[in-house]
Design a protein with these regions (language model features):
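Conserved donor nucleotide-binding strand/loop of the catalytic core
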Residues: 1-27
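Catalytic-site signature of metal-activated, phosphate-bearing donor transferases
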Residues: 19-25, 32, 43-204, 210-211
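Aromatic, loop-rich ligand-recognition surfaces of beta-strand-rich domains
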Residues: 40
């Protein structure tokens, strides 16, 4: 498919989420970068909006709304989408060094743009739990290096706040059980991140990828 559309295909050993994407950015030959993962795609309306904007760009980077697949359904129209910086000038942006959740950073003006893209998340609860278990383990050493303050308080409060942010703040309650599952697993992810960090501080031998 890529070759049919005159796209160049490059491969390299996996070097981590951020470095891998940065390598792809450096290989790109255009002025603008649209950063999408393999399980994401731009909607037709989003594509048209981007083309109109780039005809006379007002910024160096744009945050796009991401529509999340919630186990067995797309979100209700009233659900508030997360906005992520995904469109930017190549000369002004690069990936940060955060493991697992590496994201682009842009020097210059950044605006919101109503150009939605869709993310096909995990289709089953078990897949989601496996993923957040891996990701939370991958963040342990990074967070230990940052010397997170008030760890015990974060462990107690952040899971509840993560649930409320999605279920109430982002209106996931409009999505029935799928929205409830998504909010609860996000709360569990918040718990795992800080629980594993506390565990690693008490038993450094248990902070590896299999934790």
């Amino acid at each position: 498919i890529a070759r049919r559309h005159d796209a160049r295909i490059e491969t390299q050993p996996f070097a981590g989420y951020g470095p891998q994407k940065q390598a792809a950015i450096e290989l790109a030959v255009g002025e603008w970068i649209l950063l999408l993962d393999a399980d994401e795609h731009l909607t037709e309306g989003g594509r048209a909006t981007i083309l109109r904007e780039l005809a006379a760009p007002r910024a160096d980077g744009y945050r796009l709304p991401r529509q999340e697949w919630l186990f067995w359904r797309w979100p209700h129209a009233g659900t508030r989408a997360n906005r992520q910086l995904r469109l930017f000038r190549k000369a002004r942006g690069r990936m940060n060094k955060v493991p697992v959740h590496a994201a682009p950073e842009v020097e210059g003006r950044v605006l919101d743009l109503a150009a939605p893209f869709r993310h096909y998340g995990e289709p089953r609860l078990a897949d989601r739990v496996d993923k957040i278990n891996r990701y939370s383990s991958g963040l342990v050493e990074y967070k230990r290096g940052k010397r997170v303050r008030f760890l015990a308080l974060r462990l107690l409060l952040y899971p509840m706040l993560a649930f409320l942010k999605l279920y109430v703040g982002k209106r996931y309650f409009l999505n029935g059980w799928a929205g409830f599952f998504a909010a609860k697993t996000q709360a569990f992810y918040a718990f795992l991140k800080y629980a594993k960090l506390l565990e690693a501080g008490r038993d450094p031998n248990r902070s590896g990828p299999g934790a």
